[in-house]
Each structure stands twice: as C-alpha cells, then as structure tokens.
Regions:
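Conserved helicase motor core of SF1/SF2 NTP-dependent helicases
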Residues: 26, 40-42, 48-204
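Conserved helicase NTPase catalytic core signature
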Residues: 1-55, 69
Length: 204
C-alpha cells in the first residue's frame, strides 16, 4: 500500500469501500476537503476531477518535477469543461536537486524561438524554475513581486553546518528555527579534526 499503516484507512479505495452507489461515492468525495497524493497518482485518476473541483493544488518538491509530468493536472477539466483546479502553489528549491534527466544538456536544449520566448530554454528545467526565472527577471514590477516568496526559517541543519549554504546560496537570509538538533557544538567524527574540509567548516 502507498502509505504508513496508521493512515491506510484513509486511502481512497478504503474510504469508498462501503459505498454501494455512485451517488454515495460522489457525496463522500464531495465532503472531503483535502486530498493528498503524488502527481503521478492524481494524473492517473482523472475521474476524480469529474466529481470534484479543487480550489487549490499545492505541489511540493516542484523543482524535481518536469513540465510534462504536471501537464495532466494543469489541463484537468471538470464536467462543465472548466479548470478542475483553480490555482496552483508550487513549493520547491531550484538551488537544490533538480529533476532527474538522462539526456545531456545539449540533447535537452530547446532551439525553437517560440518556446524560448516563454522562457523554455531546456527540457530538463522544471515549470517551477521556468516561472521563477521569468518573474525574478522582472522583480522590480509590483505585480510580479506577488507571485513568489521565500521561506526563510529552516529546521533541518545545525547552525554551524547551515553557515556555508546560507551565505553561498541564500544570501544570508536563512534563519534557524532553534530545534534541539540544530543547537550545540558540532562534533566531528574521529580523524576529521585535521581534515582540510573540517578546518574550513570550523573556521567559517
């Protein structure tokens, strides 16, 4: 099954198991306000959009999803022929791992001018990255400033570990949440104290 055991009762096939008519299925889906799943799962269950129209779709790790993989959701229509999803919120970090693409940079390069005119220069780029590149190029415009924002509080890295990526990639804007594992002296493994990387890490 596709989730942790405590949540398996909430899988859609289990939620709908007791329904005996289409009307019951429709009513149960209509009552549910939040649906969680992968892009691939939702793209393969297009019948869902005939039963329910969604106000917003939040796509996490959007920088690791190529545009064709999102196409089914972007184009989803309800029974009235309107957009089945009213708005998309893409969450990701274009400075971390990109989508996995086997082709080389030159093989995935886009040469058509009509595609380049909308910011599509390489097929390995995610929709997130293309849109971010477009709006950040016009960052002085009051309109485009409303399209994106940056989450500045991180709860993952120890404050010492975070110093380098914070300065090198995020302009010093990252702030630690202050969780227990982020605090305290960073203890290096035996043998690393004299390592050049360790010296750089400690000195910075």
């Amino acid at each position: 099954l596709s989730c942790d055991p405590p949540f398996r009762s909430r899988l859609i096939e289990n939620v709908l198991e007791s329904c005996s008519t289409r009307r019951e299925v429709h009513a149960r889906i209509e009552r549910c306000r939040v649906f969680v799943g992968t892009v691939a799962t939702f793209s393969s269950k297009t019948d869902m959009f005939r039963l329910k129209t969604f106000d917003v779709a939040i796509v996490d790790e959007a920088t690791q999803i190529l545009e064709p993989q999102l196409l089914g959701l972007l184009c989803a229509r309800n029974v009235a022929g309107n957009n089945a999803i009213g708005k998309f919120i893409l969450i990701g970090d274009h400075k971390q791992l990109p989508a996995v693409v086997l082709q080389s940079e030159s093989q995935s390069e886009v040469c058509e001018e009509c595609l380049q005119s909308i910011g599509l220069y390489n097929l390995k780029d995610s929709l997130f990255e293309r849109l971010y590149r477009t709006v950040s190029a016009n960052h002085s415009s009051p309109t485009t400033q409303r399209f994106y924002d940056m989450l500045c509080r991180q709860g993952r890295m120890n404050v010492e570990v975070a110093q380098f990526p914070n300065r090198a990639f995020y302009g010093g804007l990252l702030e630690a949440v202050g969780l227990p594992h982020q605090q305290g002296k960073l203890v290096l493994a035996p043998g690393l104290e004299s390592d050049e990387f360790a010296d750089v890490l400690v000195s910075r």
